[in-house]
Amino acid sequence: MKNQEESGWQAFLTLCSKMQKEKFLQDLFSLFLSFGERKDVASRYHIIRALLEGELTQREIAEKYGVSIAQITRGSNALKGSDPQFKEFLQKEI
């Protein structure tokens, strides 16, 4: 089953990379992700951006975006495990 999940995820990423119009990408995510899942992705985006900016405490991030400290900790741990070049890319793009 894990192999199927990995190949499905890779196929999804490949499909995302082929989207040349933002509208198509929005339609794709609306097709594959529920409203709640899209909301979770948006929250994770805000958390990662705030952590990269480094201007707010975790408590301030939680209050500003209406997320839990646990969600922020998960985002922080994911960032800690990220490739330094990838984090540099994110800091420029986010």
UniProtKB/Swiss-Prot annotation:
Matches recorded under InterPro entries: Trp_repress (IPR000831), Trp_repress_bac (IPR013335), Trp_repressor/repl_initiator (IPR010921), TrpR-like_sf (IPR038116)
Top-rank lineage group of the source organism: Bacteria
GO cellular component, one term: cytoplasm
Subcellular location: Cytoplasm
GO BP annotations, alphabetical order: negative regulation of DNA-templated transcription
MF terms in GO: DNA-binding transcription factor activity; sequence-specific DNA binding
Portion annotated as DNA-binding: 58-81
Record keywords, A-Z: Cytoplasm, DNA-binding, Repressor, Transcription, Transcription regulation
Presence of the UniProt keyword Metal-binding in the record: no
Physiological role: This protein is an aporepressor. When complexed with L-tryptophan it binds the operator region of the trp operon and prevents the initiation of transcription.
Description of how the protein assembles with itself and partners: Homodimer.
Family stated for the protein in its record: Belongs to the TrpR family.
NCBIfam families in the record: TrpR (TIGR01321)
Annotated protein name in UniProt: Trp operon repressor homolog
Source organism per UniProt: Chlamydia trachomatis serovar L2 (strain ATCC VR-902B / DSM 19102 / 434/Bu)
Taxonomic classification: Bacteria, Pseudomonadati, Chlamydiota, Chlamydiia, Chlamydiales
